[in-house]
Amino acid sequence: KFMNLPSITANRVADSISKAFGLGNVQNSTILEAILDAYAEAGITRDSSTWTRPAPTMQRVVDKYLEGDVKKDTVYSVFRMLQDYQIFTNDTNNCVTMFEWLKSVQVIDLTLYEDNIKKLIVSLVLDVFYAEMKQLKGSDQKDGFRELRTMILVDEAHQFMKMKFNSLRKIISEGRMFG
């Protein structure tokens, strides 16, 4: 599927990080490169036959970047923060699809995190949610009512709207058709 193209995922994630932390184009490009390098290291390329391989975790991207000879700039600071907060796992056995995860009620308590970390987590969850919904066909309709597959609630969503996260805007405008 086209949505599995590494550059699509890398762009989504880099965009979320950049917007959450208020980064510019140069920093966005650096993050994008780090993600694409991790995909290449995992043997995942533009060739769709490689897309069944385990994708690199975001923690792997962060660790790999910080292990390198990098200048201590804004991207370094962001990745250090992500490493310190231990938001991501490096164990692919702990990773599930968004739909598997949402088979029951999930609550993510972000009260202890700094605002930019909260924004990043919400944005990444919504990115994955939207990408997986997009891969499904539209939900069934019966007697004028559309099937409700999943519900996602973002408390204080107005704080995220001003960040112009692409996935939140797309979910608001297109989400109904996916159920």
Predicted regions located by residue number:
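P-loop NTPase motor domains
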Residues: 1-177
